[in-house]
């Protein structure tokens, strides 16, 4: 036992002497942590776009949607140093273009530019079997138009042979009440015009003969001036000259409040609170597009939307700049669909 204790003491002394004589070594570096996934690329860091980007819009050349789209993406291209090619793909009140973009690659090189006036009505009425609010990746909103006007042929204008002699909204509604289904309303099924027409029928207690003569403003104006329909709901800019010339009468504007530059009462003022609509113009990608790309384009669009030059383009149509990011759209657009459903069911 004594031998064992002596041996242990000897070993302890050896270790102690060795420690005293050795140089002090730096503390070992901590073990590396487990590798973490890379952070998503910041919008400014992502190498996009590196080539031509395709932008599809669902309406004809020369209209408000086309004008805003081309004005926007010309400026986007200038800022990002690439070409954004705009293609007009009409049909189905925007459905054809929407489905076309849905079926394309979500690589950041395919974009849908549309206004959601018609789109959300289609979703609320289940006209489409897809969702504008869920089956795309939202990018941003760039403008709003609240200038839908209800017009008819004036009794003393150049098209007076097609006039009913109306001078006011109440004149037209009186005839519609006296002759249910006789006043011919130019609708576009599955669109904003269908919705506001239904709201006016409900608020005023009338029934129109709803006739779909085509989706473009040109088609519907030709039908009005040719006597095929009696009343048309249309963007004010498309009828401004006719009204000022005395060829058409404006019976009201479908906005919540008076629109700057348009000296006509709203339907709300005239006692029809549900005859309200607004067209918000949005940029969307195919679902699953990299959010770094989405955010980069959104930030670029925000700069343009806030510029005086873009506001001037919109003002020619009495529209206004409106920027909303994807997060805002993801909340507000589905809520608007539910409001439309409630209005149609109420």
Q: Where are the model-predicted features located?
A:
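N-terminal (or domain-start) structured segment
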Residues: 34-137, 182, 189, 206-231, ...
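C-terminal lobe and pocket-closing loops
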Residues: 239-307, 331, 335-338
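A ligand-binding cleft/hinge motif common to bilobed small-molecule-binding domains
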Residues: 117-129, 194-203, 226, 230-265
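Short helices/loops that flank or line small-molecule/ion binding pockets
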Residues: 95-106, 174-177, 198-203, 218-232, ...
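Hinge/capping helix and adjacent helix->loop/strand transition within the periplasmic-binding protein
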Residues: 76, 103-108, 124-219, 267, ...
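Short, low-complexity disordered leader/linker segments with a strong preference
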Residues: 1-52, 346
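An extracytoplasmic/periplasmic, membrane-proximal ligand-sensing/linker region
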Residues: 50-52, 202-208, 291-346
């Amino acid at each position: 036992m004594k031998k064992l204790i002596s041996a242990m003491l000897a070993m302890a002394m050896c270790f102690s002497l060795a420690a005293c004589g050795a140089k002090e070594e730096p503390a070992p570096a901590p073990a590396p942590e487990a590798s973490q996934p890379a952070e998503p690329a910041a919008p400014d860091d992502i190498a996009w776009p590196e080539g031509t980007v395709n932008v599809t819009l669902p309406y004809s050349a020369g209209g408000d949607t086309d004008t805003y789209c081309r004005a926007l993406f010309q400026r986007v291209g200038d800022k990002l140093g690439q070409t954004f090619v705009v293609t007009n793909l009409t049909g189905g009140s925007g459905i054809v273009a929407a489905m076309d973009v849905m079926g394309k690659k979500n690589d950041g090189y395919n974009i849908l530019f549309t206004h959601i006036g018609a789109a959300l009505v289609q979703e609320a009425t289940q006209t489409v079997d897809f969702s504008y609010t869920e089956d795309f990746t939202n990018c941003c909103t760039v403008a709003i138009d609240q200038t839908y006007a209800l017009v008819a042929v004036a009794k003393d204008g150049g098209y007076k042979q097609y006039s009913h002699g109306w001078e006011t909204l109440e004149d037209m509604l009186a005839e519609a009440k006296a002759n249910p289904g006789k006043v011919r309303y130019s609708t576009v099924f599955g669109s904003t015009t269908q919705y506001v027409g239904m709201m006016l029928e409900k608020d005023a207690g009338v029934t129109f003969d709803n006739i779909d003569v085509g989706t473009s403003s040109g088609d519907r104006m030709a039908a009005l001036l040719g006597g095929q329909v009696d009343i048309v709901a249309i963007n004010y800019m498309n009828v401004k000259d006719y009204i000022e010339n005395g060829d058409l009468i404006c019976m009201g504007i479908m906005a919540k409040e008076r629109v700057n530059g348009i000296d006509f009462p709203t339907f709300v003022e005239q006692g029809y609170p549900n005859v309200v609509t607004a067209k918000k113009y949005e940029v969307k990608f195919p679902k699953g597009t990299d959010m770094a790309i989405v955010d980069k384009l959104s930030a670029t669009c925000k700069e343009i939307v806030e510029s005086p030059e873009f506001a001037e383009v919109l003002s020619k149509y009495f529209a206004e700049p409106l920027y909303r990011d994807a997060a805002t759209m993801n909340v507000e657009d589905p809520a608007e669909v539910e409001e439309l459903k409630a209005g149609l069911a109420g």
